[in-house]
Amino acid sequence: MKAVVLTVAVFFLTGSQARHFWQQDEPQSSWDRMKDFATVYLDAVKDSGRDYVTQFETSALGKQLNLKLLDNWDSLSSTVSKLREQIGPVTQEFWDKLEKDTVSLRQEMNKDLEEVKLKVQPYLDEFQKRWQEDVERYRQQVEPLGTELREGARQKLQELHEKLSPLGQELRDRARAHVDALRTHLAPYSDELRQRLAARLEALKESSSLADYQAKATEHLSALGEKAKPALEDLRQGLLPVLENLKMSFWSAVDEATKKLTTQ
């Protein structure tokens, strides 16, 4: 499971969409993000699960039981891959329809975000400028003290600490003041953005297109369920021999172990 968690974490860290608000990168579509995540996660589960099965089969207990789990795991992985291939086109059709139906709302929200970004950018620039100035001032104040320490003896450590403490406290106080000022400046724009979003969603809620979209979404989900039934049945049929083989191998191993215990 560590491999699964690590893979998912890397995916989200490298695939984060937060940067698109401040940069001009072209974000992935909802379908692309969902498809990439599903592929990465399932592959991670498959690979890590196979590793655990291999480790068990090569152990002393695994060799004694001889359950042939690795063969069953490969058969199960093949069946699941087939299911993904069959359902994939239907799912993609649903997401494409969802993106098309919500394009107007997304365009309006992107416009609102861009307007707010332009309004708050000067405050962000000012915050960055003041913070850099304070850090540089702190560095200039500390640099002579570092030279003094290198040239002095150990007994000056306490003296140096006493000199650094007020400077560090001053830097923290300045940073806290800058953050408070930035929060005060940004608060109206944050409220404005929330109000705009609420208005957009309320307008969407009251529009007749929402009811149409809900009906279309229900229709697409029903179609997805109908088209997925054959694939799910194939998965069930593929699992039956795997489970039966596993059960027979297990009981065979139990019988063999019982016989060995009886003869001892």
Swiss-Prot record:
GO MF annotations in UniProt: cholesterol transfer activity; phosphatidylcholine-sterol O-acyltransferase activator activity; phospholipid binding; protein homodimerization activity
Classification of source organism: Eukaryota, Metazoa, Chordata, Craniata, Vertebrata
Signal peptide: 1-18
Function: Participates in the reverse transport of cholesterol from tissues to the liver for excretion by promoting cholesterol efflux from tissues and by acting as a cofactor for the lecithin cholesterol acyltransferase (LCAT). As part of the SPAP complex, activates spermatozoa motility.
Localization annotation: Secreted
Chief subcellular location: secreted
Family from the record: Belongs to the apolipoprotein A1/A4/E family.
Post-translational events: Glycosylated.
Subunit record text: Homodimer. Interacts with APOA1BP and CLU. Component of a sperm activating protein complex (SPAP), consisting of APOA1, an immunoglobulin heavy chain, an immunoglobulin light chain and albumin. Interacts with NDRG1. Interacts with SCGB3A2. Interacts with NAXE and YJEFN3.
One term under GO cellular component: very-low-density lipoprotein particle
Record-linked Gene3D superfamilies: 1.20.5.20, 6.10.140.380, Apolipoprotein (1.20.120.20)
Pfam family, one: Apolipoprotein
Protein name (Swiss-Prot/TrEMBL): Apolipoprotein A-I
Family annotation (PANTHER family): APOLIPOPROTEIN, APOLIPOPROTEIN A-I
Source organism of this protein record: Marmota monax
Sequence repeat spans: 67-88, 89-110, 111-121, 122-143, 144-165, 166-187, 188-207, 208-229, 230-240, 241-264
Region (10 X approximate tandem repeats) residue spans: 67-264
Residue positions where Methionine sulfoxide is found in the record: M109
InterPro entries reported for this sequence: ApoA_E (IPR000074), Apolipoprotein_A1/A4/E (IPR050163)
Assigned keywords, A-Z: Cholesterol metabolism, Glycoprotein, HDL, Lipid metabolism, Lipid transport, Lipoprotein, Oxidation, Palmitate, Phosphoprotein, Repeat, Secreted, Signal, Steroid metabolism, Sterol metabolism, Transport
GO biological process assignments: acylglycerol homeostasis; cholesterol efflux; cholesterol metabolic process; lipoprotein metabolic process; phospholipid efflux
